[in-house]
């Protein structure tokens, strides 16, 4: 019946035909119903036997030629497999080839292992970097420069490996993204084993072949996957030289019966199905019974184990204390070591600073500083340094800088005499003694004062040999030296050696010395300084993170490091046994420093003050371990390493820090015991077996003032000396110890242990503790008395008022004045007069100048970045601006809860904040959240590198639970997944139930830490465009980079002194300003929204597409701020975009297409871009940097030896470029001159980001150029432009021409601003390029440029990079300060050959910066350079009157702009968005098409608009006259300037009279003309006179005493009237007879004839007023057309 029912349902389509239904009856199928199964029949399966024994090591792979014989043999059906292929370990070659093949997208068998990565990549550096990066992640201990080594030699052939990070991840990704459901890694292994007999290791090898040839898409079925694996296995077999035979399993029934074969795949699938069913049932029961399956079954055992371990830990902690356990934790890591050996660059800095900076002024005033400086130069002497000194000295002789000649001569002598001499430490010890005083306020002060009766070099030696209190020689009392065993007194010899060392110095050249315990201010640190001065290679340890101590040691090395010296700083805990072993092993190991120590100074110590015997605890045990037990361990490790390397003829000298304090002081824990314990080593030399490895010298260190251990006792040092004990300064004791390492004393030490006593007689002092106690009591009593007297005086003064009131010493809190920072104006007499030759060779109208600039970056504005770059910290004003920018404070001017208040308040609490309090309150927050730092998700659109999100594709192995969705969405699922999705409509709704079935592939989000790019130069936290005044409705619509740029451009106008950008159009046409802002990526956030968010089905704005275009940002700038019709050009030069923008604008202005341009670049920091850079290995690996102990602020290290990639940044940089005459006319500040620029591509290649040298073409010329007579530097009567110079052909390079146009040579370049990205390749290529250019152009050797690497503080912002660099160069010229590259802790030794560059690591004040060269490189063969010249050269082209006039106007403009900017900042209105165009719509066309249209300023409101009746703004008569005269002055001869000024004043007076003092009058037209009388000769031409003058005019002229003046004045008047009529000209030769100038009693009158009358009436003129003003050699005619409807007065 059941069967019939089902059959009927199938026929009626109520049930699918393929439904699998089983019918069981209890009478026939009772076992099946009760789940009873028969026991499985045992089948004898013959185990496969490998007849060949497996080799112990991996067999050598056969050559490919042999592999051709390999084959896959199909198995005959009846024959069972009896052999299994031997499993072998993976070889490095297999992994290497797989990784390379995958990157190159080539078959794995086509990769020859005899070639290197570089050869295989065929010049593609990005690909090469990726492969090498994968190798470093995959393997350990790779050789240096693995890209140059053949693949087969990269990893030892005998090394068997497991998969590394990269290969494991690739296999995992292959399985998850390309294999069908349930065909996971385990299934793949089983398949290869069951079918081909491959073991687990060979299966992995097959999968390595698979990752080199992945399927293009996910394989649709298990069968397809098996076919893919079969093909891959065959390729592997071909390479491995093995034969694959398909395996099968056979089962036979007895003789002659039927036989059957069991398919293992089917069996495995059945087993898996049953297991899955059982698991489901188990989980369902667990859920029903509320059993937590995730809870460990052995929870009680785990808890018991935890209790046991905790008890052990508690016992250890109770015995040793947590402090002890923490104190012995190892900290040594060779990765955290820092190396300093760039003594050569420090020498260059010193010499260059001497000749170009203000160093000579300091040295001239301080004889001791001068002597130390000369010693430093002599210790760094070399041929190149001598050549540099001589070259700069010759230049100084020409410039004659006062006081420098003598210093230069002495410096040259010091260097030349020491070139072949090893470095020598000359220690200058001014003998000092302690002095303790008590002030009137009761303050106890300790000072060092000179000792009486001693002076000179040997003063310290004299002190040591002075007589004691009884008048006896005291040498043996203060210091002594004895042989520890024979007790031979060697004191006199040591004293002689001390005198010799003080006089001649000590050399430690070539010595390797380890010093522990050399913290700042310690004896050890001073010993390090002396050793470095003597040329030693010193390894010094620090117990703190290197980042906190590195600056101190870097500065020490720069001050003291001599030639051949080296300082290695490493973190080390001497209390840790492991650190003691690891440090010494690292020094001796060939993979470490590979050095044998000449000396060890285990000076590490810790204070134990205030601890008596009853208080001794775990801390004292820790210190005892550090100062005694660990010293033994460390020395023992030295012995072991020497013996392992058979070093038995070079004992390492050990200077043991002993003490005369054998409990003398008391209360110092186990300090004395530790020192006494070390003394035992003196005897162990004879009683133990290591005398060939170590030479012991005990050093009893006496009372040393100023150390960390003795600080508390310094105030009683004077009392101790009063009792005949000698105390030492830190420098004196360090000298004593260093002297023991001189060759003579080392020889004595090797013969027998020495005991050097520098106790100063302390051990002989009786009752030391009582003396100290009494002295301390006396001092404290004196202080108490002084304080009591002062308090009494204060009370008496308050009561009687008879005593004088104390003067107030509390400083008045300073207010901050926020200023834009306009450039200083040079003094005409001192700075411009010496350059007067430029007045005749340079035309301002053919000059491009920078009149404004701004930036927005990790340090905020350009001003703030400069403070950090040049000084390392913010000023008070800087902190104020930064706090405002980060929304920590806001300005109020109005009523508050505490009354009316004007000033800053806290943004959150509203509490008032004084300017002087800002640093204290917000300084830490500001420093933490600005600059280069860990990426803040808030500042990067939510991107968190610690949780970088990816989509992981998986194949669904089980049907997923149903979920509800709309019918449209459900159909979309079906469209994507087909039959792998089932849809069931929900009755009564439009929704469906959707179930994703087994076999579907889905993507699951996952988060992975992405530490590589987790550091960046982000905008200061809290920055908001709203603070700048951008309307809130625009902020979400625009991409962040557009917001950055709008804010930047607005601020750049303020820096140009322009408070309203529309003012520009008073002077130039709307079309004459260009917008050349560029970007490398454009609106990254909006681009991501358009591509990724649409894919993720997120809501996005409908016009997001427009925000992704690179030119959209420039469009927003124009639409919101300017409304110009000039060109918008959007350069895209990757990281060189900024230079390309400048280059394009320079060409545009010089070709007269524009007169002003906005240039610069903008870019964002974005997740996808950051990941892209990391895959190219271009950016710094943050994880590795942190492992090296680097702080985020240290990770951008241009030119440093340890640099490892650039740090990304974002923001915007802007400049406003302007034609020189426009800048003068407007009275704009001039920050610098753009003298020349270029862009260049590079050679043939395959690598887009590879650094090139195509930019060398900027210096292209045929040998040393010989300038012809028309050159500006040789012919002072010709005016030339940069463009004409650049076209001089092969003899003059564009670079030379750029400088020559301003009378400068290649030697006058002072600064090179480097692209300096902190990548290995760029930072070597760029200096090489610049040095080649300098060599080719003949720059004098020995005159290096200062190399500025700005990215050390900003990171690399891509497109704005060159804009920020240019801003920095302008600030360098104005401040005359060369900023430091503080992160270049050790300049790469490879840059020593770049002799035309000096890399400053400290700021340098210089006397002048004449010119700079800026270089930038971008991916995609974009190279560019810009030459800039100081603004004084531009001003030198002006005569004094013009310059003074300009100075007045620019000063007024600057003050106005400063006030306006401060007001705008405090009111959050820096950006003033234009709501509408400054003209009526109906006037637009004629304004656009009239080149003379100009905007009008409203005198009452200060706003700007185009006057419908006067679109040319001719009504502004005075302004027009001023502009005309100013322009003429620029072109006039110097001797004609005064006459021009006289005529101008007369014309201005007439205009004042006519206009009543108003700037505008009700006029229709104005005409102005100027005639230079010295150039006027037309009156001699009869034809000219006949055509242009009426009979009356000719008669008047001929009756005049000066006919030339008469005709010239009438001609100027005619021209002015003609301009006033605004009629269309008939050409230059048109007659002017229709305009007649009639003599009148008061002023000349105008009489028009014929067509001119019509023109006047057409212009709506009722009258034309005329003035002719005379100067000495010129005259000015002004014609004003008066509008009106009355009878025309000009018809007479």
Swiss-Prot record:
Give the start-end ranges of region Ketoreductase (KR) domain: 508-746
Q: Where is the Carrier domain?
A: 90-174
GO annotations under biological process? long-chain fatty acid biosynthetic process
Disordered: where is this region? 44-80, 1263-1287
Annotated Pfam families:
ACPS (PF01648), adh_short (PF00106), Fas_alpha_ACP (PF18325), FAS_I_H (PF18314), ketoacyl-synt (PF00109), Ketoacyl-synt_C (PF02801)
- In this UniProt entry, the residues modified to O-(pantetheine 4'-phosphoryl)serine are 125
Q: Where is the signal peptide?
A: none
Q: Which residues form the Ketosynthase family 3 (KS3) domain?
A: 948-1430
Q: Which SMART domains match?
A: PKS_KS
Q: Which CDD domains match?
A: elong_cond_enzymes, KR_fFAS_SDR_c_like
Q: Which reaction does it catalyse?
A: acetyl-CoA + n malonyl-CoA + 2n NADPH + 4n H(+) = a long-chain-acyl-CoA + n CoA + n CO2 + 2n NADP(+); a fatty acyl-[ACP] + malonyl-[ACP] + H(+) = a 3-oxoacyl-[ACP] + holo-[ACP] + CO2; a (3R)-hydroxyacyl-[ACP] + NADP(+) = a 3-oxoacyl-[ACP] + NADPH + H(+)
Please name the catalytic residues of this protein: 1135 (for beta-ketoacyl synthase activity), 1315 (for beta-ketoacyl synthase activity), 1356 (for beta-ketoacyl synthase activity)
Regions crossing the membrane:
none
Question: What does the record note about the induction of this protein?
Answer: Expression is positively regulated by the dothistromin-specific transcription factors aflR and aflJ.
Binding of acetyl-CoA, residues: 1569-1571, 1615-1625, 1639-1642, 1668-1670
- Biased composition (Low complexity) is annotated at 1270-1284
Q: In which pathway does it act?
A: Mycotoxin biosynthesis
Q: How does it assemble?
A: [Alpha(6)beta(6)] hexamers of two multifunctional subunits (alpha and beta).
Per the record, the similarity remark reads:
Belongs to the thiolase-like superfamily. Fungal fatty acid synthetase subunit alpha family.
Give the protein's biological function.
Fatty acid synthase alpha subunit; part of the fragmented gene cluster that mediates the biosynthesis of dothistromin (DOTH), a polyketide toxin very similar in structure to the aflatoxin precursor, versicolorin B. The first step of the pathway is the conversion of acetate to norsolorinic acid (NOR) and requires the fatty acid synthase subunits hexA and hexB, as well as the polyketide synthase pksA. PksA combines a hexanoyl starter unit and 7 malonyl-CoA extender units to synthesize the precursor NOR.
**What protein name does the entry list?**
Fatty acid synthase alpha subunit hexA
Species of origin reads: Dothistroma septosporum (strain NZE10 / CBS 128990)
What gene does the UniProt entry assign to this protein? hexA
